Amino acid sequence: NISPSGAMIINKDDKYCNYFISKAKMRNLNIITFSKKNKSADVVYLGERKNRNKFLCKFLIKGKIKFFLIPDYLIDFKENILSTLSIIVNYFYIDALPTNLFLNFKISKSRGTIIRYKNGKKNLTIIDESYNSNPLSFKFALDRFDKNYKNSKKKFILIGNMLELGKFSKKLHIKIAKYINKSKINKTHVYGNYTKHTFNKLKPQMRGKILNNKLEILNLIKKQLPNNSFLMIKGSNSTGLNKIIKNL
C-alpha cells in the first residue's frame, strides 16, 4: 500500500531485512535503514553516557554524528527511537534536529507506566503494560522488567490473554511460558482462559495463582503480594485488566 514515491523504514538487525529491501527496490521506494550494531545502516545507535536521570546518546545518521538526550525511562526503547529518527530524517535535515528532541516525551498510559501503589503500610511498584499484548511485546516488556529490577527477590507478573491471535492462540500462549521460565520472575499469576496454557508450561516453582475475576485480582494486589514487591501486569486491552488498574 506504499505509494510509488514513498519510503520504507527497515530494521537492519531483523532477519527479514534483505527480503524487505529487495521488495522496496522492486517498487523503487526510498529505503531508510536503522540498526543498533550495523554501521552500514542509515541511522545507527553508537552508545550512551548517563547523566543523572537521562542519557546522552550518540547516533550516526546519514554519515553524521548526532547526540540526543534520552530520559532514563526511554532508554530501553532503542528500536523505537531509531525508527522514529529514520522517519524524521526522511522529511527534515539532520542539522535541524535539536538535542532535546526526545527529552519531554512521555510514555502513553498502560504502555509501561510505573504506578507507586500504597495501601496502608503496603507499598508496591506496579508496571502497567495492560494496554495490549502479543508475544513480541510480551518478551520485550518481560526482559525490561527483569533487567530493571534484577536485584529484587520480589518480582511478580500478572498476565491476561493475548487476543486476536486466531488459530495460533494456544501455541503462542505456550510459547511465552518459555520466556518466563528463562527469567528470574518469582511467581506468575494468570487471568483468562488462554493464559492457562501458559500456566501449565511454567516451572512449578514459578506458578502463582489462576485468577478468575476482578475481586481475586484486587485481593492479590491489595492483600497477598508482599510489601515492597514489583508487579508487572501485561494483557490485551479487552481483557479488562486496564480498567482494573485504573481504578486501584
Outline where the language-model segments fall.
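Flexible phosphate-sensing "switch/lid" loops adjacent to ATP/NTP-binding sites
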Residues: 1, 20
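ADP-ribose/adenylate-binding Rossmann-like module
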Residues: 8-12
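A short, compositionally biased
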Residues: 49-56
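Conserved beta-strand-loop-beta-strand element in the redox core of flavoprotein oxidoreductases
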Residues: 56-62
